[in-house]
Amino acid sequence: MTNFKWIVAAAGLLFGQVLAAPTATSTHAKRATVSDAAFGYASLNGGTTGGAGGTTTTVSSYAAFTSAVSGDDAKVVYVDGTIKQTADQVKIGSNTSIIGKDANAILEGFGVLVKEKENVIIRNLGVSKVLADNGDAIGVQYSNNVWIDHCDVSSDRDHDKDYYDGLIDITHGSDYVTVSNTFIHDHWKASLVGHSDSNEDEDSGHLTVTYANNYWYNVNSRAPSFRFGTGHVYNSYYLDVSDGINTRDGAQLLVESNQFVDSKKALYSTDDGYAVSNDNDFGDSENTAEEGTLTSMPYDYTLLGSANVKAAVVGTAGQTLTF
């Protein structure tokens, strides 16, 4: 079994003011720095440092944002306030940190795409209501070493399931990705790892993704849906999530220390997907996934215990940092 030495609290990545209501807004935001260390899969392969040590820019307009995040030189881009624009995803360069200064830092109507890049950090950023024609809220394709942390991604469920696309989709053989401390909510098809049943040649042996300390709320499906790769889902709270964790097409998942409330299918397989379940509270649902073989991870981490997840995650996941 994994040696659980990594301490979430010491890394400054999880704990803060805790609220019980279904919201991700903390009364007291936690101060963070651009040098905070990535964890999970994003800590491997040399680690993920983003733009630390590079140039620093603060933006508050669409034009300034698109310009600031381009190119592969090391850079830290702070988003100050809400930027509204109906547009396709903005492509992010390698060695980039995109940081929301506070809970008001939101991209509305357009998302971001990390494609054929490496070493990217997206933290404390809100992304909302990106139409399907304009892509995902956050997309990762053909890329490695990406850390998505303390973000708030959402749309609404007032439209049909195809009005918006994914909130966080990780595809085309991407590796060493961590999604952590993020509020994922009010959406039909939330988070996809592996985009197609026919993409085995590209995805097999890749798609190594950690989901940790996340709050999933009012989601219909894909929390996440995982094809072909290797995934770790732990310390997360699920409320009103119909179809939760779906392992499929040979994926191997380790699912630990999660709590599900009002879920129809908490953990399940399709097309020969596999999972190992450890200390999960499935509520009125159950684990129907085929038994897998993934019992340890190549990094250190600490499990909160399913009974403690709600208190630790709700009110802390999401845009609860300040910079």
Curated annotation (Swiss-Prot):
GO terms for biological process: cell wall organization; pectin catabolic process. The keyword Cell wall biogenesis/degradation applies. Ca(2+) binds at residues 136, 165, 169. Binds 1 Ca(2+) ion per subunit. It comes from the Eukaryota. Its main location: secreted. The active site is at 222. Keywords: Calcium, Carbohydrate metabolism, Cell wall biogenesis/degradation, Glycoprotein, Lyase, Metal-binding, Polysaccharide degradation, Secreted, Signal. The keyword Cell wall biogenesis/degradation applies. It is found in: Secreted. One of its GO terms (molecular function) is metal ion binding. It catalyses: Eliminative cleavage of (1->4)-alpha-D-galacturonan to give oligosaccharides with 4-deoxy-alpha-D-galact-4-enuronosyl groups at their non-reducing ends. Coiled coil: none annotated. Its cofactor is Ca(2+). GO terms for cellular component: extracellular region. Glycans are attached at residue 95. It is an enzyme of class 4 (lyase). Its EC number is 4.2.2.2. Pfam families: Pectate_lyase_4. Residues 1-31 form the signal peptide. InterPro entries: Pec_lyase, Pectin_lyas_fold, Pectin_lyase_fold/virulence, PEL. Belongs to the polysaccharide lyase 1 family. Pectinolytic enzyme consist of four classes of enzymes: pectin lyase, polygalacturonase, pectin methylesterase and rhamnogalacturonase. Among pectinolytic enzymes, pectin lyase is the most important in depolymerization of pectin, since it cleaves internal glycosidic bonds of highly methylated pectins. Favors pectate, the anion, over pectin, the methyl ester. This is Pectate lyase A.
